Amino acid sequence: MSEELSFSAMVKAELALLTPELPCCRRMELAGLVRALGRLELSGRGRFALTLSTDSAPVSRKVIRLLKSVSPVRYEVMVMRRRKLRKNLVYRVHIPHQPGVAELLQLAGFIDEAGRPADWVEPPELANDHCRRAFLRGTFLGSGWVAGPEKQHHLEITTTATEAADALGQMLFRGGIAARMVARRESLVLYIKEADQIIRFLGLVGAHQALLRYEEVRVIKEMKNQVNRQVNAEVANMTKQADAAARQVEAIKRLEAAGALERVSPPLRELAGLRLAYPDASLKELGELCRPPVSKSGAAHRMRQLMALAESLE
């Protein structure tokens, strides 16, 4: 299992253990799960059945726990193995047609009050902040994914209906999160690529352990990046200094060969001799070796005079 999948699974395992205290929040979390995982089956006028499928055992247990708490409907649990990916199991919770199924579908916005299928009908409970958090948690458990912070910052939630995607975007926005949307095959994906926004989302849905882990990795990563930037800057400065020193040595040797050093002032002759004696030293260090010592700017001024004199010989 990759780092990204294991982190996403860790987040979902943590969220799957949470049980909202308020009945309205339990209803909205179940609504989010039904919305994300549910497949509506219509077998005649007003006869609905519902199947929820997931490859996460903790999520399937969360579905069952919320069903028991929210609705008295009968359900069947099936565990199947994918044909193409034999290692993966699929957990299916099938709710056959019965009294209460329509209420679940209406709760998730799949049908309107008249029982007609709809792309999205917003439950009135979503006017409450705590219920929106619960709905987002259920939706993420069903169709969300988050990358591990070690490599990249990416969190996404997948949905199918444009109206539902817009509603999710508004819920996230009201929670302080600006998600972007992209079409992917037959789905719409809301995604976040900023670390601060992902951390905010994890806190919003209640994944506090995952949030701390994400923050810890991010801080370590930023510290490493800062150290790397400092090292790169120092290496660049050292390279620049070495190149400049090499040019200075070459210029002074030309002056020496032409006998021009004998005609310069003693301070310039002193600095030229120090540069030849200490080719790796910085101008600041050369200035400190002068007698009397001079500042870095003073040493640089003298060196510019020597370089200009060498250029005049060409």
Curated annotation (Swiss-Prot):
Residues 282-314 bind DNA. One of its GO terms (biological process) is cell division. It comes from the Bacteria. Keywords: Cell cycle, Cell division, DNA-binding. SUPFAM superfamilies: Homing endonucleases (SSF55608). The keyword Transit peptide does not apply. Pfam families: HTH_WhiA, LAGLIDADG_WhiA, WhiA_N. Involved in cell division and chromosome segregation. Belongs to the WhiA family. This is Probable cell division protein WhiA. It comes from Symbiobacterium thermophilum (strain DSM 24528 / JCM 14929 / IAM 14863 / T). The gene is whiA.
